[in-house]
């Protein structure tokens, strides 16, 4: 099954879902680190500071929601946290900046509550 698809009753077995038409939409949180290309740093910073309201509103494709973005300005890198279930849309966002920077790390992350739940389940199964 690909990212961005719904999980249907027939995909995971009748015993897990009672209702025939239930769909589960899974939203994943990703942490992306970016690094501005040294030779593009001034160009990238100029573009970023001059983005219009329309450009900012349209920066992320449909299906990708920014949670936050933090910048290490002197070193030309930073972190972006997004929520999505659409791998294609996430890749499209990354590619939109590929002329000026790279995203060397893109990985799924979870919040505290989810981490505790998963750790508890892991420890309970040992």
Place the predicted regions along the sequence by residue:
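Short S/T/G/P-rich N-terminal loop/turn motif that feeds into the first structured element of a domain
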Residues: 8, 13-60, 65-76, 85-88, ...
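Short hydrophobic/aromatic beta-strand micro-patches
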Residues: 81-83
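Short conserved AdoMet
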Residues: 85, 98-99
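Short amphipathic alpha-helices in soluble, non-transmembrane regions
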Residues: 92-98
